[in-house]
């Protein structure tokens, strides 16, 4: 068991080191984005919502076709991939990195690797469910996809995408400041109260 844990830890460290090397040119930008997403300043949340709202208003105004939208998005990614590693050191000064910044960059890369592992793990579990319990897999997929299709039919595509993107960008800050845990705790307490009241009525 210990040998398996050590192997997993070593593999995680190797994957993290590899990702750090790949993203080295993006280090300064990632550190800045990390600060924004974790709401290190009070005005970061409204700034996130403002920028996202502006981007989606532009998309709504231009109303591009799917092909044009995808092409522009990929073109933007290509430009960013080319320009960011060149411009970031000149703007931020990568030679001025502190030990704390280097450690935070390592933590970000480690979290990205762990997130990727979780996603792969869930994907593998899905296929395991398909092999072991095909009926349950079939029913789960049909119900889930039908629910998603119904939501997509009720809500405008652009509005739904806006809500998803905004929620994902606000999620790290909500988690960092304990807001998610706070409301989960409140929901659990309310559920427990309802269950206790039901038990008293049954008695």
UniProtKB/Swiss-Prot annotation:
Protein name: ADP-ribosylation factor-like protein 6-interacting protein 1
Swiss-Prot/TrEMBL keywords: Apoptosis, Disease variant, Endoplasmic reticulum, Hereditary spastic paraplegia, Membrane, Neurodegeneration, Transmembrane, Transmembrane helix
Any one of the GO CC terms: endoplasmic reticulum tubular network
Induction comment from the UniProt entry of this chain: Down-regulated by apoptotic stimuli.
Swiss-Prot/TrEMBL domain comment: The transmembrane domains are required for its ability to shape the endoplasmic reticulum membrane into tubules.
GO molecular function per UniProt: identical protein binding
Tissue: Expressed in all hematopoietic cell lineages, but the highest level of expression is found in early myeloid progenitor cells. Expressed in brain, bone marrow, thymus and lung. Expressed at low level in liver, kidney and spleen. Not detected in heart.
Main location: membrane
Cell compartment(s), UniProt: Endomembrane system; Endoplasmic reticulum membrane; Endoplasmic reticulum
Subunit-level organization: Homooligomer. Heterodimer with ARL6IP5. Interacts with ARL6. Interacts with TMEM33. Interacts with ATL1.
InterPro entries referenced in this protein's UniProt entry, alphabetically: ER_autophagy_membrane_reg
Membrane topology: Multi-pass membrane protein
Residues exposed to the Lumenal side: 63-65, 176-203
Organism per entry: Homo sapiens (Human)
Record carries keyword DNA damage: no
Annotated family: Belongs to the ARL6ip family.
Function, as annotated: Positively regulates SLC1A1/EAAC1-mediated glutamate transport by increasing its affinity for glutamate in a PKC activity-dependent manner. Promotes the catalytic efficiency of SLC1A1/EAAC1 probably by reducing its interaction with ARL6IP5, a negative regulator of SLC1A1/EAAC1-mediated glutamate transport. Plays a role in the formation and stabilization of endoplasmic reticulum tubules. Negatively regulates apoptosis, possibly by modulating the activity of caspase-9 (CASP9). Inhibits cleavage of CASP9-dependent substrates and downstream markers of apoptosis but not CASP9 itself.
